[in-house]
């Protein structure tokens, strides 16, 4: 498996500068990562720097809390696409989910998907803040929408993706819904394990060390 092409090489630190983004982009080019994941403010820059490459631009909406007004999320998504984003990773409104306002969640996701059309939409459910039962319910809920992916984590909570998270999501998702694992993925072993559990995209800021793990493993044979 060529893991490089299913990695979203990620830099979402609030202190990231344009120079940091340019370094991220050069790393993505060097290692042929499938995508970079950056804050919306840097999408225009990335579009310019990634001209004539196949590297996708992923950006985040309603990040990292998910509690913005839905109309703001929609506008943010629309502007991100206009600036050159290929994919949107939006954060679910976790408070609304906790109080079981499921129709609100469905409407918000579908409105954003309508806003971005054929572009890929991933919904972050922030598994760290959910019980196993809630992860199952959130997975079923996202499966009932027009979203393309369910994503485990923002990377800004107290933990990221876990093996248990992936197992629950896999058991409860629809056939059409893909899985992106993110948050705390720091080594090849985690990535390989999550891949076996059904994840087909990975968000990580530790991409370079993971690729080194992969190269070292290949050199052993």
Curated annotation (Swiss-Prot):
Give the subcellular location.
Answer: Cytoplasm
List the EC numbers from the record: 4.1.2.4
Q: In which pathway does it act?
A: Carbohydrate degradation; 2-deoxy-D-ribose 1-phosphate degradation; D-glyceraldehyde 3-phosphate and acetaldehyde from 2-deoxy-alpha-D-ribose 1-phosphate: step 2/2
Predominant cellular place of this UniProt entry's protein: cytoplasm
Query: What EC class does the entry list?
Result: lyase
Per the entry, what this protein does is: Catalyzes a reversible aldol reaction between acetaldehyde and D-glyceraldehyde 3-phosphate to generate 2-deoxy-D-ribose 5-phosphate.
Q: Which NCBIfam families match?
A: deoC
State the name under which the record lists this protein: Deoxyribose-phosphate aldolase
């Amino acid at each position: 498996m060529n893991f490089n092409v299913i990695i979203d090489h990620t830099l979402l630190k609030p202190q990231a500068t344009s120079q940091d983004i340019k370094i991220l982009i050069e790393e993505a080019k060097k290692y042929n990562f499938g995508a970079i994941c950056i804050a919306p403010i840097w999408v225009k820059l990335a579009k310019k720097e990634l001209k004539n490459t196949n590297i996708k631009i992923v950006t985040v909406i309603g990040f990292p809390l998910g509690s913005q007004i839905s109309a703001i999320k929609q506008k943010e998504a629309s502007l991100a696409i206009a600036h050159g984003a290929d994919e949107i990773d939006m954060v679910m409104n976790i408070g609304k989910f906790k109080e079981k306002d499921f129709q609100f969640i469905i409407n918000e996701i579908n409105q954003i998907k309508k806003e971005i059309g054929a572009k890929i939409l991933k919904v972050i459910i922030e598994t760290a803040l959910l019980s196993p039962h809630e992860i199952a319910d959130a997975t079923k809920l996202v499966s009932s929408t027009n979203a393309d992916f369910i994503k485990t984590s923002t990377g800004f909570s107290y933990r990221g993706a876990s093996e248990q998270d992936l197992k629950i999501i896999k058991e409860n998702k629809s056939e059409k819904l893909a899985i992106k694992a993110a948050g705390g993925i720091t080594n090849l072993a985690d990535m390989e394990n999550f891949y076996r559990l059904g994840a087909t995209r990975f968000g990580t800021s530790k991409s370079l060390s993971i690729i080194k793990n992969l190269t070292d493993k290949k050199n052993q044979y």
